[in-house]
Amino acid sequence: MQPNLLIADEPTTALDVTIQAQILELLNELKAKLGMAIMLITHDMGVIAETAQRVVVMYGAQVVEEAPVGELFKEPLHPYTQGLLRSIPRIDVAATSKKKLEPIPGTVPTLRGPEKPGCRFAPRCALAKPMHFDNTPPLKEVRPGHKVACFLY
């Protein structure tokens, strides 16, 4: 019996780039050899850009965006995804720009206690309105294959 799915949770975290490349190559070989899908759980947007076909972005244990990898990097819709991508150093921009990285303001929500209504990102979101604190946005398809959980769409 061969698996249909391999779940790899942070397989490249804290590895140097050489070992990271070897791990990713091994995962791709397994995928091709066994004809299985890989669910890659990572915070490394570079790894995502290089290896993923679809991306699911989560914030505070809630899915906030799902899209094909190219579309997500080209046009992220959720304010958290936008902030996440703006906070990544870029070599092509850093050499010619004095623009600083933009950290996401605020702190990560606690997941202790009962789940509260509202968008979990609302306390950190510059675009949040009162309704965002009281209602949880549904994940809805706003373009073919691109879903977002945000009342702005």
Model-flagged regions — what are they?
Residues 2-3, 7-11, 15-97:
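P-loop NTP-binding/switch modules centered on Walker-like glycine-rich loops
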Residues 68-153:
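Charged, flexible cofactor/metal-binding loops and thiol motifs
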